[in-house]
Amino acid sequence: MFISGRRTADKWRAEERLQCPAGSARAALARCADGGAVGPFKCVFVGEMAAQVGAVRVVRAVAAQEEPDKEGKEKPHAGVSPRGVKRQRRSSSGGSQEKRGRPSQEPPLAPPHRRRRSRQHPGPLPPTNAAPTVPGPVEPLLLPPPPPPSLAPAGPAVAAPLPAPSTSALFTFSPLTVSAAGPKHKGHKERHKHHHHRGPDGDPSSCGTDLKHKDKQENGERTGGVPLIKAPKRETPDENGKTQRADDFVLKKIKKKKKKKHREDMRGRRLKMYNKEVQTVCAGLTRISKEILTQGQINSTSGLNKESFRYLKDEQLCRLNLGMQEYRVPQGVQTPFMTHQEHSIRRNFLKTGTKFSNFIHEEHQSNGGALVLHAYMDELSFLSPMEMERFSEEFLALTFSENEKNAAYYALAIVHGAAAYLPDFLDYFAFNFPNTPVKMEILGKKDIETTTISNFHTQVNRTYCCGTYRAGPMRQISLVGAVDEEVGDYFPEFLDMLEESPFLKMTLPWGTLSSLRLQCRSQSDDGPIMWVRPGEQMIPTADMPKSPFKRRRSMNEIKNLQYLPRTSEPREVLFEDRTRAHADHVGQGFDWQSTAAVGVLKAVQFGEWSDQPRITKDVICFHAEDFTDVVQRLQLDLHEPPVSQCVQWVDEAKLNQMRREGIRYARIQLCDNDIYFIPRNVIHQFKTVSAVCSLAWHIRLKQYHPVVEATQNTESNSNMDCGLTGKRELEVDSQCVRIKTESEEACTEIQLLTTASSSFPPASELNLQQDQKTQPIPVLKVESRLDSDQQHNLQEHSTTSV
């Protein structure tokens, strides 16, 4: 068996020598050594491999002699080299072939299906013990074994293509270029220096030092000193077949990170400056001293900006109270942002001929035809406190002014941003008066739950998001004390804060423009009241809160079994936050009388603040002169409460129809911190756009209720106390003045109250407050807090004359 295997190998080797030239003997020998015998038969060829060393040396000598002839030919350029030059011979030749002939020192040669090895620089081969080199300066060119004589082309030698290996990936090599004497391009050196090399054993680090030595000799640039030793950098092939080094990725990432970080650093440092004309001395930007302002001269050599100087002169004139012509808004003042509608409103001044005409703006709505009066607190900030009071008097006089038909000229008047000094209403009462009882509706239900304002504040805070909250609205509470079924309490500190505004001080139910003379603010039957609305929104059925009360089951079982297709609409419920058209009034029955109303709006924020005030209400107001037509068209029941006076909602289609019939209206959007005034006989409807806490009250103006009528009301109230028996004492409260006297002294005090032109008694008798003594027409309202039996006696003597 052993002999037959050996004969078979000898026979195969003889056939290979006949078919292949001497140049391909080593390839055949390699195939015979590795594939010709398996297992114990492999040792037979070890001795025969040594016999082939001489033939290999002859082949290498012949290749070295043919190289000068090939180099003498015309060489192509680096970028236009033929494809055969790019592919280089395998590393299974030369010294590795000779090493294979010594089995005691080196392992046998790897099979021919391994990767090809690329040699980038055609420098001299490193000296070896077994392979003698041909003397001479000529560098041997490594060529692949030539093909058989029948298939060899006449042109230059081209490497024979090998079958693609099954276990290793293909590599794409850069074109082989011969380095010329002289300096090279930096990119060329980088490409050769960082190229991937492998040794004869497949280890990329085995030939690293030799290649570095070659670079040093070829370039000729680093002849002295220690050569720089750098580890070969790794290359990663991309999907297009191109190679990219790992350091390129790192550099790209660093550049991207630096750019991004630079943007983030510069993002928050931009100063908000709108114009050079609004930069004041306080900002340190104009560099204008006070001496220059007083002299009124500009030095041309100082390089001052004329526009900045003009603005500062105008600003100084604004604060000097110099008169009507000089009192104006500085020409350089520009608001940060305003809508087109607001810009058109501010551009229209109301020519009243007074000192404050530039601060009053009149809007004539083109769609509805009604007039609206506007004032802006950012413009009024230039006014002093005394001038603010005078402006508020003039503004309110225009607001409630009427024509010969007793119809107001303006459908609405707004002071934008006038309530900015007040705290958030809901936060104020939740933290200062947490146990105040309130009535809270369940969202989307008709149930009412009684809770504390602190608990309501917690629910709003938990469900608030982006301007709305998903909890039930809070019904109105009284801020001047609860009567009968009302909810609320008396909050004198909060009322004092309201009176700090000159607009509210005159228009509160006990204000200077009111016809009522209340000795105590808790006696007011006209408010103020406060309520909170969540804003109109669509609520998914899954988010709808469940009622705490049990519902009765429907008696009709067929309705429960009926199938209603959903089509494409989601299952959600519209929560309407609307107050239909109504007219504010006082009195009941024959005493019904329309009156004016005042409101203050504070948006529910919970930490979401913005530069622009948020829109809270969408309001439609009809002109007071069209009061009768609107009542007939909308079928209002004026004797009902405001919530139930009208059964239909007035939308755009209805407004257009009413406008064609000659009815005028105004459509306004009220924002956070706005104070609005509605004259009498103005029918209006509200829609809550976002979560808002509102204050509102009625005011009985003096022009609506003459002094004679107020005096008669005071006489009737005094008549009620005339018939009371029993002893009454004089008590003075911090807020209220209660007049309690003996029955014998009642007639004298009634005469005092009914006679407006009589002299006022000294303060020592009635212990009146100082501000009441200075009033020109003192009218005192007698307050009686009686028991049930005393109230019965009061009704019996109500018809008694004075």
UniProtKB/Swiss-Prot annotation:
Motif Nuclear localization signal: positions: 252-263
Record note on cofactor: Binds 1 Fe(2+) ion per subunit.
Protein name per UniProt: Lysine-specific demethylase 9
UniProt keywords, alphabetically: Chromatin regulator, Dioxygenase, Iron, Isopeptide bond, Metal-binding, Nucleus, Oxidoreductase, Phosphoprotein, Ubl conjugation
Extent of Low complexity compositional bias: 152-170
Cellular compartments per GO CC: nucleus
Domain of life, source organism: Eukaryota
EC class: oxidoreductase
InterPro entries in alphabetical order: RSBN1/Dpy-21
Region (Disordered): 65-244
PANTHER family xref list: LYSINE-SPECIFIC DEMETHYLASE 9 (PTHR13354:SF8), ROUND SPERMATID BASIC PROTEIN 1 (PTHR13354)
